[in-house]
Amino acid sequence: MIIAILGTGYVGLVTGACLANMGHTVHCIDINIKKIDNLNKGILPIYEPGLEELVRKNVQGEKLYFTNKYDIIEQCDAVFSAVGTPSKEDGHADLQYVFAVAKEFGKHIRKRSVFISKSTIPVGTTDRIKKYIELELSERKEEIEFDVVSNPEFLKEGSAIEDFMNPDRIIIGCESDYAHLVMSSIYKAYSDDKFLFTDIKTAELIKYGANSMLATRLSFINELANLCDKVGANIKDVANGIGLDSRIGSKFLNAGCGYGGSCFPKDIKALIKTGEENGLKMNIIKATEETNNNQKHILYNKLYNGAGKVEFPIKTIAVLGTAFKPNTDDMRDASSVVFINDLLNDELKLGPFEKIKIYDPIALNYAKKVIGETNEKLVYCNELDNAIIDADVIVIVTEWDQIKNINLEVVKKLMKGNLIIDGRNIFDRNKIEELGFIYEAIGY
């Protein structure tokens, strides 16, 4: 089958590479000429484990192509929309890119084809997409059959290829037997028990519901962790005890310094707006967002607590991890950004800080763009040891393996101080305190 992917971000690039690997001929289209030129040179715009190799393999196998021309749509049996849907200032999903590619689909189809939304879009958006396509065909004075489908993605950054190749489920919202047949053909490598065929609006809402449920679990466990800090309980054991209930399970019950990324924050905002437009307050979802926004300031508050337990001034801070999660370079809505801004603002007057040393094994270049390089206090470190040397305090923001597996005895020798703020609860409190560290974690 000949397939086009509109957009070459996380979703588009992973989807295109994986579909090509399944035997389809895939053309990835993006209006960013520089990005397409780089992709044709083998330079990817994102970091995702295994993706560079998968792209190279399928480009060499003449199954995967990159272009900035929409003309290839004329040949395609199916066209996936994988463009961004960022949040507007008021919280609504910005759908301008979705409608723009829908128009291009309407301008270029020459035979019956299926327009498939991979992008996360609010309920009812696919109906609007259909109208945009119909309008383009009307202006062309052409009557060409087409179908619209909602096929939301459920890819986790850091394990996106595995998620695509071995999905928990494949959600497909469609209205015609033809669309059903095309989607079944695209995903013919998967067993029938992976599929849930439903109506379009239901498919759209499943995606928002899933992300909101996961975000709610994280905010819930973080609230419990904060209570543990107050009453002297252990959030690790609390989460374990809760997760042992088969009705609940253990996933997404790791307390920390807040969630971020390209999905949860914007999808929460969009779902709240969808509820408001339909006369619903969405109180639980609002509380999830508020709790997470507050949680991102906890590292600065923990630093304040820790500063009261040490006898030395805190001059140099090592911030370990900037990406919103490990195994990605994504800095969108990352807790590290909030923490570093808290340090620079220093409302509690913990400073003056002389150096804020920042380390991330993958996302450092993106961190420089997001956080900036103009403040002379900020020192970006390519090596973990360089960030730790002479630090009065270490603050762990992202649970990279490089950080989790660090030799704490070596850390003790390299540091000037002995205070560790653990925003992801990666260390064993007893062991770390036996080594002479003062340890501040989240509910633990």
What are these regions (language model features)?
Residues 1-444:
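Structural/interface elements that position substrates and couple domains in central-metabolism enzymes
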